[in-house]
Amino acid sequence: MKFDTVIMGGGLAGLLCGLQLQQHGLRCAIVTRGQSALHFSSGSLDLLSALPDGQPVTDITAGLDALRRQAPEHPYSRLGAQKVLTLAQQAQTLLNASGAQLYGDVQQAHQRVTPLGTLRSTWLSSPEVPVWPLSAQRICVVGVSGLLDFQAHLAAASLRQRDLNVETAEIDLPELDVLRDNPTEFRAVNIARLLDNEEKWPLLYDALSPIATNCDMIIMPACFGLANDTLWRWLNERLPCALTLLPTLPPSVLGIRLHNQLQRQFVRQGGIWMPGDEVKKVTCRRGTVSEIWTRNHADIPLRPRFAVLASGSFFSSGLVAEREGIREPILGLDVQQTATRAEWYQQHFFDPQPWQQFGVVTDDAFRPSLAGNTVENLYAIGSVLAGFDPIAEGCGGGVCAVSALQAAHHIAERAGEQQ
């Protein structure tokens, strides 16, 4: 099977790269083993929240300039501030075109409220998520009886420290009792599958309506809206106060929705989606990828002109830790890591951890190297890249988006030259 590009990994980076390549008229396939990290994320995307020295970032342009001085090997530093901002804006346009109408500005970070009621600097958020400063003084944090994925009293306690009048309440929907037989089934995603049925909408409205008359804003867990935000908008039009949603413990309704919107758009535009498959071997000839062998296609290889590695980091098994060191399991690419295992981590759990910055070694075009030699038609994007800490620096989503579009533009340019 011949393709212009085969992407190994179907997470945020892989999907955005595929969508951008389709804009250039290239035929793409995505091989994906299972659920991506988006299923376990908040659904919000960070661009740059803090510098390596811990200084918070609000002005993104100034932050990118400072980042280049502090971390010259960071993926952003390799591209330059203006290029990063341009690609981030293109990514936001691509997300909106896929149906993910996210709120945010590439020039200026905003503060979103987290499930614990604290504030986190971010780039893009779902419109349902409350953004600081809140537009209300009287707030009610509403939990769902029996839902362990969200603790209303914890969020309320944090918000009270910001001089807000915050109460808590709990709604009990007997219609959800079918899920209560097994506590492991009473999760936000399963509740959403039930509440998203239009016939159930009035039940949720009836439960929230008495609470809404006594406050200016309701904050509740994101336990509906798995396909779109239609129910949220329907409730906001009818309730006498604003309704906002906070992501829950994973799996996350907002994260799954974002992934599904991107995946459906990729397929709509003619992309080949290969779920439940796994790349077992990649054949390289004369420094280029010639064939990709997958578990489901056995002896029928995929033959791409270009290949993209978007396999993620440790969480997605894009990187594997062993006693001897860190390795990239598909091709055995060169990996940037510390000299000894003892240097992988810091003693204090909440300190920035060195292993977070491990990843494949690439050139400035994000082409990785194998035994010191660049693989000419292979690009590495997203969390598999080295040189950044997605947690401490708050840049995971941004690196995925920016590197994906950079690789896509580079591939499109080279594909045009080869025609």
UniProtKB/Swiss-Prot annotation:
GO molecular function: glycerol-3-phosphate dehydrogenase (quinone) activity
Reactions listed under catalytic activity: a quinone + sn-glycerol 3-phosphate = dihydroxyacetone phosphate + a quinol
Signal peptide range: none
Known cofactor(s): FMN
Pathway this chain belongs to: Polyol metabolism; glycerol degradation via glycerol kinase pathway; glycerone phosphate from sn-glycerol 3-phosphate (anaerobic route): step 1/1
Family classification: Belongs to the anaerobic G-3-P dehydrogenase subunit B family.
Lineage, highest ranks first: Bacteria, Pseudomonadati, Pseudomonadota, Gammaproteobacteria, Enterobacterales
Pfam families: FAD_binding_2 (PF00890)
InterPro entries listed in its UniProt record: FAD-dep_OxRdtase_2_FAD-bd, FAD/NAD-bd_sf, G3P_DH_GlpB_su
Keywords of this entry: Flavoprotein, FMN, Oxidoreductase
UniProt KW Flavoprotein keyword: yes
Gene Ontology CC terms, in alphabetical order: glycerol-3-phosphate dehydrogenase (FAD) complex
GO process terms (BP): glycerol catabolic process
Subunit structure of this chain's protein: Composed of a catalytic GlpA/B dimer and of membrane bound GlpC.
Protein name per the record: Anaerobic glycerol-3-phosphate dehydrogenase subunit B
Leading EC class: oxidoreductase
EC number: 1.1.5.3
Function as written in the Swiss-Prot or TrEMBL entry: Conversion of glycerol 3-phosphate to dihydroxyacetone. Uses fumarate or nitrate as electron acceptor.
Taxonomic superkingdom: Bacteria
